[in-house]
Amino acid sequence: MANTAQARKRARQSVERNKHNSSLRSMLRTAIKRVRQAIATGDKAVAGETLRKASSVIDRVADKNIIHKNKAARHKSRLAAAVKALA
């Protein structure tokens, strides 16, 4: 239990940050799933468009340090390779 005013405030901030970060992580996972679903359908145009949107989401989440920049690069690289493999 937080005893000082500062500790109580930090506890409140932590709860709010956790909600916000969870929302961003969920948005990231959803964007990645949408690209994978588009790849599964085999439509390169739709997959390319969803990849563009997902790349934006991945970069935003990485910029906010929700995920590491290398993890973001890995996600983008693998998704782009999968979209490129569609012929």
Swiss-Prot record:
GO biological process: translation
Keywords attached to this entry: Ribonucleoprotein, Ribosomal protein, RNA-binding, rRNA-binding
Cellular component aspect of the GO annotation: cytosol; small ribosomal subunit
GO MF term (any one): small ribosomal subunit rRNA binding
Region annotation Disordered: where it falls in the sequence: 1-24
Pfam families hit by this protein: Ribosomal_S20p
Cystine pairs: none
Gene3D superfamilies in the cross-refs: Ribosomal protein S20
Similarity comment text for this entry: Belongs to the bacterial ribosomal protein bS20 family.
Chain's role: Binds directly to 16S ribosomal RNA.
Protein name as catalogued: Small ribosomal subunit protein bS20
Species whose genome carries this gene: Bordetella avium (strain 197N)
Lineage: Bacteria, Pseudomonadati, Pseudomonadota, Betaproteobacteria, Burkholderiales
Name of the coding gene: rpsT
